């Protein structure tokens, strides 16, 4: 009767899909799986070294692109400065002429000022918000002291151009200083033997090794260890300490980059000369500084626009020609200033890319030094404890395979594989080892 009840219980359990998997491999088979997994780990160790060198190549490529950008910036700077010189020359010539059409321009200016003030303060209250009262008084004083002739010859645009030129020079100097210091450190780092020699045979693997008459650290198992320290001294090696100068230099290079990337000197100027009147918060600073930002809103006031359209050629044709010459050179200077700013942004992007690569390099170096320390012994890198296939269960998906492994000095790591990764798949242990390495590295980063 008891036997019958037991059979019924087993059948019910089976029907409910609650039978857990059983160990399916012998000790010899587990050993073979361990050997296969360790081969994969050994290959990944060598890939880690190559990963460091790959990042080095990317940094060098970025550095070469930076140098090319600097050449382009130098050419663009010459063109921009030439256009600025032409603009200043035309401005000085125009200022030398007696002011004409004064009555017409002054009448329009008196109607332009209240509209300009109202438009600017409305913008400031909506976008900038703070300090409207003080800004309003400053603006009224600024407008009363300004001349419609300054307005007529686009003096505000010329002043904006000159200020942008000053800021752009400051930005370029800051980035140049940062990149020069970081590049010097990086060049010194990459001259080290680690980067200038090819690694040894990456396919070597000997899980059990040979009996040693001398201490095992004189016969390092990993080719990584042998390529990093081919003539090892007596005593355990600490690869983290060996790499410490590398870590220090990478940190110094990162600091050289990051300090400038977050420096106030790296605030790019607003060069959207053609987008006057838009809700640009950067105009707030200019308005608070000297009220000239309000002149960017002249396009919203009809009488202000009429000042720009005043034709004084009948009174003084030469002055009209000079004004046209000024406007032409001004447009060229604005276009070249915008192009120059785009190149500066590209250079900043290269700096950010290099900073990110330095962070990756530091992370990869940390991983390589950790692997080098872990692979000095004679034991297999990866040992498989159990391989179990589960049928359907309330907590475990149907037909998954669980592989419990010990990797290096870790606690047991459980790798769960879906049904499509069969135990008969030649890449079965590669997948197990890959997932185990990922988990091991994740836990190492958290410690």
Swiss-Prot record:
Leader sequence segment: 1-21
GO cellular component entries: aggresome; apical dendrite; cell periphery; cell surface; chromaffin granule; cytoplasm; cytoskeleton; cytosol
Localization in the cell: Secreted; Nucleus; Cytoplasm; Mitochondrion membrane
One Pfam family recorded for the sequence: Clusterin
Membrane topology reported for the UniProt record: Peripheral membrane protein
GO biological process entries: amyloid-beta clearance; cell morphogenesis; cellular response to growth factor stimulus; central nervous system myelin maintenance; chaperone-mediated protein complex assembly; chaperone-mediated protein folding; endocrine pancreas development; estrous cycle
Chain location of the short sequence motif Nuclear localization signal per the record: 77-80, 441-445
Stretches assigned to coiled coil: none
Top-level division of the source organism's lineage: Eukaryota
Reported tissue expression: Detected in Sertoli cells (at protein level). Detected in cultured Sertoli cells, testis, epididymis, liver and brain.
Modified residues (Phosphoserine): 132, 394
Disulfide bonds listed in the record: 101-312, 112-304, 115-301, 120-294, 128-284
Post-translational events: Proteolytically cleaved on its way through the secretory system, probably within the Golgi lumen. Proteolytic cleavage is not necessary for its chaperone activity. All non-secreted forms are not proteolytically cleaved. Chaperone activity of uncleaved forms is dependent on a non-reducing environment. Polyubiquitinated, leading to proteasomal degradation. Under cellular stress, the intracellular level of cleaved form is reduced due to proteasomal degradation.
InterPro entries reported for this sequence: Clusterin, Clusterin-like, Clusterin_C, Clusterin_CS, Clusterin_N
Gene Ontology molecular function terms on file: amyloid-beta binding; low-density lipoprotein particle receptor binding; misfolded protein binding; protein carrier chaperone; protein-containing complex binding; receptor ligand activity; signaling receptor binding; tau protein binding
SMART domains named in the record: CLa, CLb
Glycosylation sites (chain numbering): 102, 144, 290, 327, 353, 373
Primary location recorded for the protein, binned into one broad class: secreted
Quaternary structure note: Antiparallel disulfide-linked heterodimer of an alpha chain and a beta chain. Self-associates and forms higher oligomers. Interacts with a broad range of misfolded proteins, including APP, APOC2 and LYZ. Slightly acidic pH promotes interaction with misfolded proteins. Forms high-molecular weight oligomers upon interaction with misfolded proteins. Interacts with APOA1, LRP2, CLUAP1 and PON1. Interacts with the complement membrane attack complex. Interacts (via alpha chain) with XRCC6.
Protein task: Functions as extracellular chaperone that prevents aggregation of non native proteins. Prevents stress-induced aggregation of blood plasma proteins. Inhibits formation of amyloid fibrils by APP, APOC2, B2M, CALCA, CSN3, SNCA and aggregation-prone LYZ variants (in vitro). Does not require ATP. Maintains partially unfolded proteins in a state appropriate for subsequent refolding by other chaperones, such as HSPA8/HSC70. Does not refold proteins by itself.
Family named by the database record: Belongs to the clusterin family.
Protein name (record): Clusterin
Gene name per UniProt: Clu
């Amino acid at each position: 009767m008891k036997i019958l009840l037991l059979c019924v219980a087993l059948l019910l359990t089976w029907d409910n899909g609650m039978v857990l998997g059983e160990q399916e491999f012998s000790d010899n088979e587990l050993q073979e799986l361990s050997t296969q997994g360790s081969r994969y780990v050994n290959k990944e160790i060598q890939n880690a070294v190559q990963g460091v060198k790959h990042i080095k190549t990317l940094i060098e490529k970025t550095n070469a692109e930076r140098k090319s950008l600097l050449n382009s910036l130098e050419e663009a700077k010459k063109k921009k400065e030439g256009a600025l010189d032409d603009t200043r020359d035309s401005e000085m010539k125009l200022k030398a002429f007696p002011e004409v059409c004064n009555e017409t321009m002054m009448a329009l200016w008196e109607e332009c000022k209240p509209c300009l003030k109202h438009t600017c303060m409305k913008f400031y209250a909506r976008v900038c918000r703070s300090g409207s009262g003080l800004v309003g008084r400053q603006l009224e004083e600024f407008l009363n002291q300004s001349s419609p002739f300054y307005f007529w010859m686009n003096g505000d645009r010329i002043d904006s151009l000159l200020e942008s030129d000053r800021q752009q020079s400051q930005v370029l100097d800051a980035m140049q200083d940062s990149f020069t210091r970081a590049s010097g450190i990086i060049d010194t780092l990459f001259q080290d033997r680690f980067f200038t020699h090819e690694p040894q045979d990456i396919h070597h693997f000997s899980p059990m090794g040979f009996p040693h008459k001398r201490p095992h650290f004189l016969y390092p198992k990993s080719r990584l260890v042998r390529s990093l320290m081919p003539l090892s001294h007596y005593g355990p090696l600490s690869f983290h300490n060996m790499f410490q100068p590398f870590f220090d230099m990478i940190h110094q290079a990162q600091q050289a980059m990051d300090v400038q990337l977050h420096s106030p000197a790296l605030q790019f100027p607003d060069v959207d000369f053609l987008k006057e009147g838009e809700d640009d918060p950067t105009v707030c600073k200019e308005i608070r500084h000297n009220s000239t930002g309000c002149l960017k809103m002249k396009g919203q006031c009809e009488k202000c626009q009429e000042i720009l359209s005043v034709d004084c050629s009948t009174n003084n044709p030469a002055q009209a020609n000079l004004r046209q010459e000024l406007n032409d050179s001004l447009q060229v200077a604005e276009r070249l200033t915008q192009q120059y700013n785009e190149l500066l942004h590209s250079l900043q992007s290269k700096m950010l890319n290099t900073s990110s690569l330095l962070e990756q390099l530091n992370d990869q170096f940390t991983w390589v030094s950790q692997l080098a320390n872990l692979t000095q012994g004679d034991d297999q890198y990866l040992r498989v404890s159990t391989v179990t296939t589960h049928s359907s269960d309330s907590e475990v998906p149907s037909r998954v395979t669980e592989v419990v492994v010990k990797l290096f000095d870790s606690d047991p790591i459980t790798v769960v594989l879906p049904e499509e990764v069969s135990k008969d798949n030649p890449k079965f242990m590669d997948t197990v080892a890959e997932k185990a390495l990922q988990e091991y590295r994740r836990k190492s980063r958290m410690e």
